A protein has these predicted regions:
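Catalytic cores of eukaryotic secretory-pathway lumenal/extracellular enzymes that build
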Residues: 2-3, 119
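C-terminal cap/loop subdomain of S1 sulfatases and analogous C-terminal strand-loop tails that border
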Residues: 8-13, 17, 22-132
Length: 193
């Protein structure tokens, strides 16, 4: 992302930290003078005469951007499919892949399901930005065994995310183009004969 904030963000500075689009809401609202909006939204926040009680998976980047702290506030990033499945996660330099698309192509790959891996793949995105390590060297799987410790913070990050569903369950299921999913939805709504 590119950011210009005269007098706050140092010109020509570069950060390799992770920022998601949903981080813009808490960051911009905080910059406008309303800090902690994410916590306020969880307990019920009134704006423009309406009360919003919702959990948004965004992080306020203002303390990091202003130099108030050197610690980035986002612990990691989850990658989702358009069906709502957690495909992978990013944790610092590492990407941990739980499901992958084996089909190659454009729309053709979208027509085929993801493969759920029995053991996650691990990539160091600083040294392997194109994620080729699993297909090029003979020592890739030895490397996974040496980096098993990454599964602990991965489990915590995913667990913390899933924990939010207790108080804030998903509002809707992801749309599907699968015929069986569409038929199930029609049958559960009582619209089929």
């Amino acid at each position: 992302c590119l950011l210009r904030w005269p007098g706050v963000v140092e010109p020509n500075s570069v950060s390799n930290e992770i920022v998601g689009s949903h981080d813009f809401l808490p960051t911009l609202v905080s910059a406008a003078g309303e800090p902690d909006v994410m916590e306020k939204l969880k307990s019920g926040y009134e704006a423009n005469g309406k009360t919003y009680k919702v959990h948004i998976d965004g992080y306020d980047m203002t303390p990091y951007l202003t130099g108030e702290t050197e610690e980035h506030s986002r612990p990691g990033f989850l990658y989702f499919s358009d069906d709502g499945d957690i495909l992978a996660m990013r944790y610092h330099n590492w990407k941990i892949v739980f499901m992958e698309q084996e089909t190659k192509g454009t729309l053709y790959l979208w027509m085929h399901p993801f493969l759920t891996l029995r053991t996650p793949k691990i990539f160091n995105l600083r040294t392997d930005p194109f994620e080729y390590a699993d297909i090029t060297p003979n020592t890739y799987y030895d490397s996974i065994l040496r980096h098993e410790y990454l599964f602990v913070p991965a489990q915590k990050l995913v667990g913390d995310f899933l924990e939010t569903f207790k108080e804030f369950p998903p509002r809707q299921k992801a749309a599907s183009f699968s015929l069986s999913d569409v038929l199930d939805k029609l049958q559960s709504s009582g619209r089929s004969n």
